[in-house]
Amino acid sequence: GSALLGYSRFHRYGLDIVAAFDKHPDVIGRVIHGREVLHISKLPHLARRMRVHVGIITVPADAAQEVANLMVSGGIRAIWNFAPAALDVPEGVIMQREDLYSSLGVLLQRLNAVLDPLHSQ
């Protein structure tokens, strides 16, 4: 999640990350790439107040559905999901899942083809 917070080119695509959330006391209150990390319970209220349309999930799989539910209750209409989990959201909420494991598999397969072209055919 902190890598996405630090990515400065999202604004070119109309995305401005306005807040970060966590539930761990040792993270809450820290400032990461200029944004204070807030307790996850504040997400719905802040999302509604700031009219946030897109939420980004970068939590472990077992926490992802809870975060998605909070986003939906805050009026978020599109979720960019980096968690390794399929999430259930209501109709009308757009979900884009980034499967890092599949991407890694493709990358390694392509690397093997370059490193050992005779055995990859």
PLM feature segments, named:
Residues 27-30:
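A glycine-biased structural micro-motif
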Residues 1-14, 18-24:
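Glycine-rich adenosine-cofactor-binding loop
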Residues 33-120:
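Phosphate-bearing ligand-interacting subdomains
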